[in-house]
Amino acid sequence: MAKVQYMGTGRRKKSVARVRLVPGNGKVVINKREIETFFGLETLRVIVNQPLVLTGTKDKFDVLVNVHGGGFTGQAGAIRHGITRALVKSDETLRPELKKAGFLTRDPRMKERKKYGLKKARRAPQFSKR
């Protein structure tokens, strides 16, 4: 018999997270490392666990994640998005609660491109009167 698992893909900035929810006791493993060793900052760990805490499913699923691209914040947001999508696959009645919290919406904000004639996306070269 196949093991029950729920898959979800999350994205944020340049990060892509492939999330699997497996019935378990609430262990979160990211790229074969525990969440405590992968994310040093407590705020990033809180972001990852938000959907599980909101729906009260923290102790019902083990979360297995493969994430690549981007930085820490983008990866945390991508994991949260992936966990949310997987939770909705596991139980459709959680959708309104997660939608209201804004976890189902893909954050569209991306890095603005650098324009020629400027130092960065908006930073102009220093102006000199003389």
From Swiss-Prot:
SUPFAM superfamilies: Ribosomal protein S5 domain 2-like. It comes from the Bacteria. Keywords: Ribonucleoprotein, Ribosomal protein. The keyword Transmembrane does not apply. One of its GO terms (biological process) is translation. InterPro entries: Ribosomal_Su5_D2-typ_SF, Ribosomal_uS9, Ribosomal_uS9_bac/plastid, Ribosomal_uS9_CS, Ribsml_uS5_D2-typ_fold_subgr. Residues 99-130 are annotated as: Disordered. GO terms for molecular function: RNA binding; structural constituent of ribosome. Residues 99-110 have a biased composition (Basic and acidic residues). Gene3D superfamilies: 3.30.230.10. One of its GO terms (cellular component) is cytosolic small ribosomal subunit. Residues 111-130 have a biased composition (Basic residues). HAMAP family: Ribosomal_uS9_B. Belongs to the universal ribosomal protein uS9 family. NCBIfam families: PRK00132.1. This is Small ribosomal subunit protein uS9. It comes from Clostridium botulinum (strain Eklund 17B / Type B). The lineage of its organism: Bacteria, Bacillati, Bacillota, Clostridia, Eubacteriales.
